[in-house]
Amino acid sequence: GVLMNPPYSAKWSASSGFMADPRFSPFGKLAPQSKADFAFLLHGYYHLKQDNGVMAIVLPHGVLFRGNAEGTIRKALLEEGAIDTVIGLPANIFFNTSIPTTVIILKKNRTNRDVYFIDASKEFDKGKNQNIMTDTHIEKILEAYKSREEIDKFAHLASYEEIVENDYNLNIPRYVDTFEEEEVEPLTDIVSKINKTNKAIESQTASLLEMLGQLHGTTPEADAE
């Protein structure tokens, strides 16, 4: 297997000669000069064992949804069934960057083209300078990864058809809905709270005026007016 954590969105030559390179040629386009992310990914993927190779690469989220050349490469990888799992990690867990990152797991010779999405962006404890993923957080991700089951607000197995419907865009919120419904307070409760507040303000105002009146009658300054 291959594990990679390359420099994010680094520059590279993207020289047209690379289109003849077997690492890149099957995917129709080269990674853009300003973002070598897919060049690293394809380099690692090329070196996987043909029968059962597995690779995990850490990259910025942009690789999941950016268009143009990167969109073409992503589509080719998805058509091939190469992308097995996409895991969204919390922001600020690495020393060298605070941006949220994603782990993409690729496999050679898969028999299907579905993609398992895990949104682990909230799986961390707050540390002094950065966020920390504990063994418990990592275990939760691994359990989900092994099961490939639907987990509310955490994981979703997207069929290839669903990915095509989303134009090969792998942005995690398209597949894992983490929206928390805010509890809606009944209007009658809101009105009664407002009434109570108004009454409290009225009574406080009355008390204040009364105190001012007492002051007015007792201070020497008031008498001198």
Protein language model features and the residues they cover:
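A conserved structural/catalytic subdomain of Rossmann-like adenosyl-cofactor enzymes
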Residues: 1-225
